[in-house]
Amino acid sequence: MPAATVDHSQRICEVWACNLDDQMKRIRQVIRKYNYVAMDTEFPGVVARPIGEFRSNADYQYQLLRCNVDLLKIIQLGLTFMNEQGEYPPGTSTWQFNFKFNLTEDMYAQDSIELLTSSGIQFKKHEEEGIETQYFAELFMTSGVVLCEGVKWLSFHSGYDFGYLIKILTNSNLPEVEQDFFEILRLFFPVIYDVKYLMKSCKNLKGGLQEVAEQLELERIGPQHQAGSDSLLTGMAFFKMREMFFEDHIDDAKYCGHLYGLGSGSSYVQNGTGNAYEEEANKQS
């Protein structure tokens, strides 16, 4: 099967509190042969801005991320599993974890919630049947998916995505200093390829995830702005780009571990069109 070919028999599995244990058992088996994990999250937007003086634009971007991730809760996590050839496991390839979220008690940006609601996210069900993040973290830590150098993470403009995962896994606020954030990131996720960061070496590729997918002639499975579908599309985009622009080989020294808009990837945040990182935080990808 060619890399990133769409097969409509691939299924996205919805995970709630009631089936979390069973699905994590399945994932422990899947990760053994399918060690590329494409990831996306849905979260309730941006509600705060950091105040004070900042050493650089990069520092401001991290502090913006930190204050919002500390204040807010993750809503969904999508994980798609693929192998070195970009092939999916038989049956289910994508797991969409739905976390406990309460519109009455939890903070959010109104426009983000409206977007997610229109995308089909069922907030009443999240309130009643959502996964507790601390229990998820316990299972995830022993799943073979994190803390493993053999697992390769694929993402798209993913500072916030990894921010929420680190917050869940450490059960604490994010570090005050960006360098400490990247040290924790490398511990949990030793190998990361951010597709948006890779795009700087891909002539004519531009825009958010949906726009990039259309340029690569990829067909989405499932609804946009849901984490499962977005993670699946991210994985497809990575393998198509690797084939088209990188001759099926990514230079780890140049690309591995860089997140678009943070740290060494921060110089690509602003290209004359305003603050791209805040746009991503509001899920305009």
Swiss-Prot record:
Q: Does the keyword Nucleus apply?
A: yes
The UniProt note on the cofactor reads as follows:
Binds 2 divalent metal cations per subunit with RNAase activity being higher in presence of Mn(2+) than of Mg(2+) or Co(2+).
Q: Where does a divalent metal cation 1 bind?
A: 40, 161, 278
Question: What is the top EC class of this enzyme, as a single word?
Answer: hydrolase
Report one GO cellular component.
P-body
Where found, per UniProt?
Answer: Nucleus; Cytoplasm
Keyword Protein biosynthesis among record annotations: no
User: Main site of residence?
Assistant: nucleus
Q: What does this protein do?
A: Has 3'-5' poly(A) exoribonuclease activity for synthetic poly(A) RNA substrate. Catalytic component of the CCR4-NOT complex which is one of the major cellular mRNA deadenylases and is linked to various cellular processes including bulk mRNA degradation, miRNA-mediated repression, translational repression during translational initiation and general transcription regulation. During miRNA-mediated repression the complex also seems to act as translational repressor during translational initiation. Additional complex functions may be a consequence of its influence on mRNA expression.
Q: Which family does it belong to?
A: Belongs to the CAF1 family.
- In Swiss-Prot or TrEMBL terms, this protein is called CCR4-NOT transcription complex subunit 7
List the source organism: Xenopus laevis (African clawed frog)
